[in-house]
A protein has these predicted regions:
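Bacterial Sec-pathway N-terminal export signals of envelope proteins
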Residues: 38-88, 94, 238, 244-289, ...
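Small/polar, glycine/serine/threonine/aspartate-rich low-complexity segments that form flexible
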Residues: 86-120, 247-255, 289, 302-368, ...
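Periplasmic alpha-helical coiled-coil/stalk elements that build and connect Gram-negative outer-membrane
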Residues: 152-266, 411, 415, 435, ...
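Transmembrane beta-barrel architecture of outer-membrane proteins
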Residues: 111-115, 159, 204, 211, ...
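Membrane-embedded beta-strand positions in outer-membrane beta-barrel channels/transporters
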Residues: 115-117, 161, 264, 363-365, ...
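Short segments within alpha-helical structural elements
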Residues: 63, 75-77, 211-236, 419, ...
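Sec/SRP-type N-terminal targeting helices
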Residues: 59-63, 76-77, 108, 122-150, ...
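Terminal intrinsically disordered/low-complexity segments used for targeting and assembly
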Residues: 1-50, 220-265, 311, 315-319, ...
Length: 488
């Protein structure tokens, strides 16, 4: 860990005026009169919240997460028994066997059946348990994927937001440089009219003024483009009112740059890309257990009940007398008679059939896989390949994160060193310019020397401004890797 202390808080722009003055200058230029730059202000958090809510790519990713949640619900439901019920009503024609009488019939018969069945798996090689654990891991992996995409969006929005802040400050710098040159032009003209300076000095300052006006136009265009880029990232209508809030973006007097190893160790526990890759390793391991479970016998408990009705089901309804009926002869050929009768049959009542045909069944079933054309073996081999792929993907993600943190650490340290150097350079050029301007007003230096001094100062101010925002952004990236979010 490296701790750096600053004794004095540097000011980037020694000639920077009050914010109210800058606002009035920009208002006069018409910048804030356009629909893009109105009175409505958005903070960085407002922009991030809006992007996370309305980003289409993120919404698509959330569909994957929602789909994984439904699969997880199904995993819990797989432990419940199945319950089915069915009813049928129909007619049979021609020769058929009635299921309730077991007799052949050639007449049209109306039949009805009602049946309910249930089944529950008692053992299947722990497939339901493993499938549940697999979907828990899958749901977790998709959630981390969503967080990873959210992080990418936050970084993109943060970078675009800071680009707008930088562009606004750059416009202020250009405005101030233009104001300095305008004031110097007035003094130069006065000195020329007083005979102290030649006309060439006035022309040199006027040329410098035209150059600064061009710089201001370029700065305003860059600001407009920065706003447009941010608006496009937020999927807003460019015609709507939009302006950002200006947070305090000063460099701290005392700050700490953690070593890259410490940041990396913390990032391993908070970065969703790492946790997603790790979840997929566990998913692949659980998939192998699932596939191996297909080799196990499946023991199920089954229950069934039902009843039915048939028009072919008849019952005895009485007898019909036929009078004396000869049934044979005695030895002496005397005929033998008895009272004849016919049995009267009727269709068995519906309620009685439903009651009498009611049946129940409870039993166990065991299915033992013997030969399945190497299907299970092939599944297991595929799952092992997926496990190796997931492990390599984790290592790749881990290495990429380590490289990114190492690079971010080096960038942050270099950005601070550059910022320190530009501040020192700015202080020196600022003092040199004031000294040159005093000598120029006395006619002791030429307009060429004055313009060169002012050009060096303007360049130093721009470099200091760029170094400031570059350093702040690099530090925010380091904080983001440690799970501290992106805040200004």
């Amino acid at each position: 860990m490296k701790r750096i202390h600053k004794k004095n808080k540097p000011q980037i722009f020694s000639t920077m005026q009050a914010k109210t003055t800058v606002f009035l200058i920009l208002l006069m230029s018409g910048l804030f009169s356009s629909p893009l730059f109105s009175q409505q202000t958005w903070s960085l958090q407002d922009c991030i919240d809006h992007a996370l809510t309305h980003n289409i790519e993120l919404r698509l990713q959330r569909f994957n997460e929602e789909d994984a949640a439904y699969s997880l619900e199904q995993s819990y439901a797989n432990f419940f028994p199945t319950l089915d019920a069915n009813m049928s009503h129909g007619y049979s024609f021609g020769r058929s066997v009635d299921p309730f009488t077991n007799e052949f019939s050639t007449e049209r018969i109306m039949r009805q059946n009602a049946r309910a069945s249930s089944s529950v798996v008692l053992f299947a090689g722990f497939q339901n348990v493993n499938y549940l654990r697999y979907n828990i891991l899958r749901n977790t992996a998709f959630r981390f994927d969503t967080e990873k995409l959210q992080n990418e969006i936050i970084l993109t929005i943060g970078a675009a937001y800071m680009q707008v802040l930088y562009s606004e400050d750059f416009v202020e710098t250009a405005e101030q440089q233009l104001e300095v040159i305008s004031q110097q032009l007035e003094r130069t003209r006065a000195l020329f009219e007083g005979g102290t300076l030649p006309r060439g000095s006035v022309l040199e300052i006027e040329a410098r003024l035209a150059e600064e006006e061009l710089n201001l136009i370029t700065a305003r265009n860059n600001l407009r483009m920065a706003y447009i880029e941010l608006i496009q990232l937020l999927d807003l209508d460019p015609a709507e009112e939009f302006n950002i809030e200006r947070p305090v973006t000063q460099v701290d007097e005392e700050f700490v740059i953690l070593d890259a190893e410490s940041v990396f160790e913390k990032a391993l526990n908070v970065q969703p890309a790492i946790m997603s890759a790790n979840s997929r390793i566990m998913m692949a391991e659980k998939q192998i257990e699932l596939d191996r479970g297909r080799r196990s016998p499946v023991l199920s408990l089954n229950a069934d009940l039902g009843t039915g009705y048939s028009q072919a089901a008849m019952q005895f309804a009485g007898r019909e007398g036929l009078g004396p009926v000869q049934i044979g002869y005695l030895e002496d050929n005397t005929p033998v008679f008895t009272d004849g009768f016919n049995n009267i049959m009727e269709i068995k009542p519906y309620r009685d059939q439903i009651r009498d045909n009611f049946y129940q069944y409870v039993g166990l079933s065991l299915r033992i896989p013997i030969v399945n054309r190497w299907e299970v073996r092939t599944r297991i081999q595929h799952s092992k390949v997926d496990l190796l792929r997931a492990r390599d993907q984790y290592e790749l993600t881990r290495n990429n994160l380590n490289k990114a943190i190492q690079q971010a650490h080096a960038d942050a340290l270099a950005a601070y060193q550059k910022y320190e150097a530009t501040i020192k350079s700015l202080d020196a050029f600022n003092e040199s310019f004031h000294y040159t301007r005093q000598r120029f007003d006395l006619g002791m230096v030429s307009s060429v020397e004055f313009n060169e001094s002012q050009t060096r100062l303007a360049r130093a101010e721009r470099e200091a401004l760029q170094a400031k925002y570059d350093y702040i952004f690099k530090v925010k990236i380091m904080e983001f890797y440690m799970g501290e979010g992106f805040r200004l």
